[in-house]
Amino acid sequence: MTQWTDVAVLPSWWLCGWVDTDSPGYRTVSIGGTPYTAAAGYHRWPDYIGAIDTAVGAGSWAATVNNRGAVRLSGSSAAVVWTDRAGWLMGMGTDPADSEGSVTSVTSRTPPPGCIPLIGANWVSVDRTAESQITVDRWQRGHGYVWGSAELWRWRLRMVRDAVPSFRSGHLLSGKVTLTSTLPDPSWSDSPWSSSNSSGYLDGYVVGVEGGRWLGPTREVYEVDLLVATAVGS
């Protein structure tokens, strides 16, 4: 089976969540017995990794993102303990209090549930007059009701098999998300999408998920529609 780190085609898009570090949950890692905590804020994914990088930098470690979206923390040999769910969010496959032992680096073992790589993406505006009630997949337990002054979009996303569990794990199925074609590392710099900037990023709030399906008999590529609300004119 093809692994996400071995796919010949590099990601062309990323679906990234936002992370709240005002409260405990996804903000602290212990290195060499010292806890390092990301600065408080509501961070787009690249800024979140940047906040982690700044925090662990006090211990002479660094947080980076490779060209497939995997997060890597590295530095001098030290015991690494994930004191909260930051490790899980970054794809380390860990639970709170899990230890990596004494290491010089740790790298995402799965596509990070906080920001998954995509091998394709496109979007269309949803006609709210024709689609005032939208049925979503069963893991969302119900329907999305569309109302107010927001615009609704259907983002069609394609991902490799290994990214599907990370997508379904929940962080990207609610709250604010960003769709970007620029590598979401701490140096991320992009401009919003517009008619004159077709490669720009899109921000929105998840309303629901429609119709996941495998493309082809090998079940290596998965396609799903994400319903996203944006401010009028975004």
Residue ranges and their predicted role:
Residues 52, 56-88:
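Short beta-strand-centered interaction patches in the first periplasmic/extracellular domains
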Residues 24-31, 71-73, 177-182:
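Short polybasic amphipathic segments
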Residues 32-34, 40, 72-79, 158-161, ...:
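Secondary-structure transition/turn motif
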Residues 1-13, 115-234:
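Extracellular/virion structural assembly segments
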